[in-house]
């Protein structure tokens, strides 16, 4: 509803011994003057495969805030697509990931700035250790200074991505 605030928790966990495949999809719409805080925790065993897609559309002066923690899965992938569809829409995307042991974690963010005065902030941090692998990519489309970022973390590398701000010219 217009001007409302909501908090949603997406918790994906399980024991280390169980073998599983998860394919999760979430489609959220943030209305005018509303704020949505989405908390996502991925903490599954080394024998799990977790593929997740989140689609978010943000209305006028609305804000979508993602707090993402990827702490475990044999293979984990997040595809996040955010559409800043109206003037002064905003997104704040923060997260951390730990790819240790033989885990492989992929994070792909795509932010479309489709209206004037939109704003997005991305702040992701990660660690890869052992034989663990982590992939992070960011595309901020339609922004006045759109940039593409791509980082690959290899064993024994600590990955600390600088935060980035993209704004659509008014």
Residue positions per predicted region:
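Conserved beta-strand/loop scaffold segments within soluble protein domains that form the structured core
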Residues: 1-170
């Amino acid at each position: 509803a217009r001007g409302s605030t909501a908090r949603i928790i997406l918790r994906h966990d399980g024991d280390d011994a169980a073998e599983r495949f998860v394919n999760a999809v979430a489609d959220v719409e943030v209305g005018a003057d509303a704020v949505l805080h989405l908390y996502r925790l991925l903490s599954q065993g080394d024998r799990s495969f977790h593929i997740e897609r989140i689609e978010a559309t943000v209305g006028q002066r609305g804000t979508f805030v993602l707090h993402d923690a990827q702490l475990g899965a044999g293979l984990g992938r997040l595809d996040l697509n955010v559409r800043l569809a109206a003037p002064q829409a905003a997104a704040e995307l923060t997260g951390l990931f730990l790819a240790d042991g033989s885990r492989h974690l992929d994070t792909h963010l795509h932010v479309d700035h489709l209206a004037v005065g939109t704003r997005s902030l991305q702040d992701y941090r990660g660690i890869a250790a052992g034989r663990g692998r982590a992939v992070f990519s960011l595309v901020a489309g339609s922004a006045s200074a759109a940039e593409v970022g791509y980082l690959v973390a290899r064993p024994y590398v600590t990955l600390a991505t600088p935060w980035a701000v993209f704004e659509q010219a008014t």
